[in-house]
């Protein structure tokens, strides 16, 4: 077998470019790579004309992170201290040799020549007046020890409390403290006594200075959602001892206002089939549903357990209606009953004494027959209310015809449109006259009967 030839590594693009550029035998990928004329170089060249990334350190390899530097992850930069005193340049101290004199000679100032400038003449008035005397008597001056108080105020740039007003330091001028105060004049002052505000104990007003504009809604108990199964319980033990419906041997009872926990064996039977596999009964809730007071509890079933200990089961809403919510009965004001001498009376009318003759005012129930005749007929109907405001009586009864004189020739059709016949009245509406009640001396109330009139 012929041995395989060893593969030699190709020279780099820079080495090939140095030898093949002059002869023109360079591969097509060498010249663009060395002269930076590839597609990527063209994109960077023309894209840099519109976007500037200077100062960010991109592609420099310095690792400085740009002008701002790198910030470690999970930390924030420390705040810079600003507002402090500005640094001043140091004062240059000239070295002094041991042989140099300790007395510094004064440097004479050179004369300043103002060419063409007007001469300034100091004013003769104002300013200080200097009085000199040639007395040889030494002056006696009262020199006393004075204490000068100097106050320095330093501001901390890291902590500044804007709510505290810093007092101004005293002003010093020639060793004297200048204090100014307004002039206080004596005037008459009026004394006004203070009164105590009236504190009312009524609950009509708000209890706080800024009452809430609206009342926050109470949290709603989602008892009728689709995730809950609705089960009605009729056993009265559900109100007082619900644990008896779930298990038999549960001697510990914590009360009806707390949630109940139950632990079952692998095989068990509940006293009530509706409470099978119940592992938790939540605290009760009393609600109103469609005019009923309802006692509710939410139960959790433990139908399935996972290896991690999680239980999977449905949630059930157990409820029992206690009693209906009755509305308040409407109150009707009743008038007092007044006993009178007569059997029939009106509570709104004044008492009456006259007793009319029963013969003149007799109304009996009878059958009346009305037949057509040549005389004109006059109809009359009177309605008397139940409450009569005066002391007179009117009988209301059926329509009765009264014969009157003929005022002209009556109109009678030749052929009647409908067959005519006699009209019979079989009933009437009326009140009996009070005089008929006195026939009986017993104080007995006679009921009034109302009948309809049929024609």
UniProtKB/Swiss-Prot annotation:
Record carries keyword Kinase: no
Subcellular location: Virion; Host nucleus; Host early endosome; Host Golgi apparatus
One Pfam family hit: Late_protein_L2
Residue window of motif Nuclear localization signal: 1-11, 438-446
Main location: virion
Gene Ontology MF term list: DNA binding; structural molecule activity
One cellular component term from this protein's GO annotations in UniProt: host cell nucleus
Lineage top rank: taxon: Viruses
InterPro entries reported for this sequence: Late_L2
Post-translational modification: Highly phosphorylated.
Disulfide bridges in this chain: 20-26
Keywords: Capsid protein, Cytoplasmic inwards viral transport, Disulfide bond, DNA-binding, Host endosome, Host Golgi apparatus, Host nucleus, Host-virus interaction, Late protein, Microtubular inwards viral transport, Phosphoprotein, Viral penetration into host nucleus, Virion, Virus entry into host cell
Gene Ontology terms describing biological process: microtubule-dependent intracellular transport of viral material towards nucleus; symbiont entry into host cell; viral penetration into host nucleus
Oligomeric form and interacting partners: Interacts with major capsid protein L1. Interacts with E2; this interaction inhibits E2 transcriptional activity but not the DNA replication function E2. Interacts with host GADD45GIP1. Interacts with host HSPA8; this interaction is required for L2 nuclear translocation. Interacts with host importins KPNB2 and KPNB3. Forms a complex with importin alpha2-beta1 heterodimers via interaction with the importin alpha2 adapter. Interacts with host DYNLT1; this interaction is essential for virus intracellular transport during entry.
Purpose of the protein: Minor protein of the capsid that localizes along the inner surface of the virion, within the central cavities beneath the L1 pentamers. Plays a role in capsid stabilization through interaction with the major capsid protein L1. Once the virion enters the host cell, L2 escorts the genomic DNA into the nucleus by promoting escape from the endosomal compartments and traffic through the host Golgi network.
Similarity-based family: Belongs to the papillomaviridae L2 protein family.
Full protein name: Minor capsid protein L2
Organism whose genome encodes this protein: Human papillomavirus 11
Organism phylogeny: Viruses, Monodnaviria, Shotokuvirae, Cossaviricota, Papovaviricetes
